[in-house]
From Swiss-Prot:
This is one of the proteins that bind and probably mediate the attachment of the 5S RNA into the large ribosomal subunit, where it forms part of the central protuberance. In the 70S ribosome it contacts protein S13 of the 30S subunit (bridge B1b), connecting the 2 subunits; this bridge is implicated in subunit movement. Contacts the P site tRNA; the 5S rRNA and some of its associated proteins might help stabilize positioning of ribosome-bound tRNAs. Keywords: Ribonucleoprotein, Ribosomal protein, RNA-binding, rRNA-binding, tRNA-binding. The keyword Transcription regulation does not apply. InterPro entries: Ribosomal_uL5, Ribosomal_uL5_bac-type, Ribosomal_uL5_C, Ribosomal_uL5_CS, Ribosomal_uL5_dom_sf, Ribosomal_uL5_N. Signal peptide: none annotated. The lineage of its organism: Bacteria, Bacillati, Bacillota, Bacilli, Lactobacillales. Coiled coil: none annotated. Gene3D superfamilies: 3.30.1440.10. This is Large ribosomal subunit protein uL5.
Length: 180
């Protein structure tokens, strides 16, 4: 079963991008490469149970097993030692990536309180888009009663676009609700 968002990309978005940017080959049209979800759990330093909860929540959100990230440097002010587990991340590609993006755009983002669209300024100069979510409760897989603590997460949409203009156009055509 092909994903609706993938079909939309192939049938509508890719031809529109080729026409707008005058590409000579369909392979030049930007596409989504991967989506990385990252959840920093700074309080895992004092209580490792918090990290286990974050891993479980990210597993439910992404539908795939996350990896635990470790501290690169020791920082005395944060009581942090090099190699301590301080976060979790998961990289989505292929069908799961399109399913997640579809779910994010159509279900999760509209559930954000006072939602007026996502910032159109969060591009990195190379066509990749970063989005911060303040609470994991906007995802339908997370059960409100099971959550001990509200945590945020970062979502990075990595594209093959050469610049921000191409990346913004790609995400706009896919349905990302940018603020006006």
């Amino acid at each position: 079963m092909a994903n609706a968002l993938k079909e939309k990309y192939v049938n509508e978005v890719q031809p529109a991008l080729i026409e707008k940017f005058n590409f000579t080959s369909p392979m030049q049209a930007p596409k989504i490469d991967k989506i990385v979800l990252n959840m920093g759990v700074g309080d895992a330093v004092s209580n490792s149970k918090n990290l286990d909860e974050a891993v479980e929540e990210l597993k439910l959100i992404a539908g795939q097993q996350p990896v635990i990230t470790k501290a690169k440097k020791s920082i005395a002010g944060f009581r942090l030692r090099e190699g301590m587990s301080i976060g979790t991340k998961v990289t989505l590609r292929g069908a799961r990536m399109y399913e997640f993006l579809d779910k994010l755009i159509n279900i999760s983002l509209p559930r954000v309180r006072d939602f007026r669209g996502v910032s159109s300024k969060a591009f990195d100069g190379r066509g990749n888009y970063t989005l911060g979510i303040r609470e994991q409760l906007i995802f339908p897989e997370i059960d409100f009663d099971q959550v001990n603590r509200v945590r945020g997460l970062d979502i990075v949409v990595v594209t093959t676009a050469q610049n921000d203009e191409e990346g913004r156009e790609l995400l706009t055509l896919l349905g990302m609700p940018f603020a006006k």
